[in-house]
UniProtKB/Swiss-Prot annotation:
The keyword S-adenosyl-L-methionine applies. It comes from Bacillus subtilis (strain 168). Probably acts as a heme chaperone, transferring heme to an unknown acceptor. Binds one molecule of heme per monomer, possibly covalently. Binds 1 [4Fe-4S] cluster. The cluster is coordinated with 3 cysteines and an exchangeable S-adenosyl-L-methionine. Pfam families: HemN_C, Radical_SAM. S-adenosyl-L-methionine 2 binds at residues 61-62, 121, 133, 158. This is Heme chaperone HemW. Might carry two S-adenosyl-L-methionine binding sites with only one binding to the iron-sulfur cluster.
């Protein structure tokens, strides 16, 4: 096992678009949660053996919503239990610009964290307020500069497009401002309105006014062209990086490789079995105490399912799915398994089917879901 994801489900506030497993941190049993999280790690490793991890990613929620003492407790626990060695190439933490003090940054740096992912979303203060964010544009500059001063040389900025009230001009301003910071990595996602969110409730009432689909496609084109013009290469549908600064942890997912998933609501992929942990914090703590593991669901992945996942995850990468690696992994030819699908998608101009790989065309990136769905139920 080369990768571990750790979920911290606490936030100081809830964003209007977020459907991740998260809770207001006030009145939550945070220390009990951290104790249960440590126990889950210990119990899992007792079963699988000590891993030689290459990547660790702490997400949420908002990991940096923890107090300085709690953040240090988390870092100490990870280093004590997971025992990352010099082979660990990426130790990443998601952070909010408004709660990232110099002291918290020092705690992360001293613990071995070498990559930060800032939830920026937009550099328009009025849009930030509309989507339920509490930070301002100036907070991003302050936190970014502070992180640089403390020695972080790998910073990613998360941005969004297709937001309510967002214009092409807004987006261009946000992308230009983000690029002016000269970060190593940029994730730029289109808004997807998910159930159980503030935006979903507004949409149900006819009160959410989003850019039309054609404009959203134009926004994505702007993102791609500006990144390319700035020398930031696209390596996945929504991700852009300087050479060599791609997210190694996320490439684990897109390459359909296995990983630990620790914490409330976390997903894991261990020994050919996909696991989903319970989401509610109290339920998670109780299950760890009673059973040692917090699984809500486990599913042994069939070979057919693995192959489907290989295609719809792998095609998210600009490099696509390697035919050589596919054959080594599954003992079968990619062209032999999907002859009609590959022919149809190539004729529609959505994929390139070369001798070595299958990958999306420019048009395929715009219609990715159509491409991914074509491989489902074909085996």
């Amino acid at each position: 096992m080369k990768s571990a994801y750790i979920h911290i489900p606490f936030c100081e506030h809830i964003c209007h678009y977020c459907d991740f497993n998260k809770y207001f941190i006030q009145s939550q049993p945070v220390d009990e949660y951290l104790n249960a999280l440590e126990q889950e790690m210990i119990n899992t490793i007792a079963k699988t053996g000590q891993p030689d991890l290459k990547t660790i990613f702490i997400g949420g929620g908002t990991p940096t919503s923890l107090s300085e003492e709690q953040l240090k407790k988390l870092m100490d626990m990870i280093n004590r239990v997971l025992k990352p060695s010099s082979d660990l190439s990426e130790f990443a933490v998601e952070a909010n610009p408004d709660d990232l003090s110099a002291e918290k940054l020092k705690i992360l740096k001293e613990a071995g964290v070498n990559r930060l992912s800032f939830g920026v979303q937009t550099f328009e203060d009025d849009l930030l307020e509309k989507i339920g964010r509490v930070h301002k544009q100036k907070d991003v500059f302050t936190s970014f500069e502070r992180a640089r001063e403390i020695g972080f040389e790998n910073i990613s900025l998360d941005l969004m497009f297709g937001l309510p009230g967002q214009t092409l001009k807004h987006l261009e301003h946000s992308i230009n401002t983000a690029l002016s910071l000269d970060a190593e990595h940029y994730s730029v996602y289109s808004l997807i309105v998910e159930p159980k969110t503030v935006f979903y409730n507004l949409m149900q009432k006819g009160r959410l006014h989003l850019p039309p689909q054609e404009q959203e496609a134009e926004m994505y084109e702007i993102v791609m062209s500006k990144m390319e013009a700035h020398g930031i290469h696209q390596y996945e549908i929504s991700n852009f990086a300087k050479a060599g600064m791609e997210s190694k942890h996320n490439l684990t997912y897109w390459s359909n490789e296995q990983y630990f998933g620790f914490g409330a609501g976390a997903h894991g992929y261990i020994g050919g079995t996909r696991t989903v942990n319970v989401g509610p914090v109290k339920h998670y703590i109780d299950l760890i105490a009673e059973k040692g593991f917090p699984y809500r669901d486990t599913h042994e992945v069939t070979t057919e399912e693995q192959i489907e996942e290989e295609m719809f995850l792998g095609l998210r990468k600009t490099a696509g799915v390697s035919k050589k690696r596919f054959a080594e992994k599954y003992g079968r030819s990619l062209d032999g398994l999907f002859p009609s699908v590959l022919k149809d998608l190539a004729e529609k101009g959505l994929i390139h089917n070369s001798e070595s790989a299958v990958y999306l065309t420019h048009q395929g990136k715009l219609l990715g879901n159509e491409v991914f769905g074509a491989f489902l139920g074909e085996l």
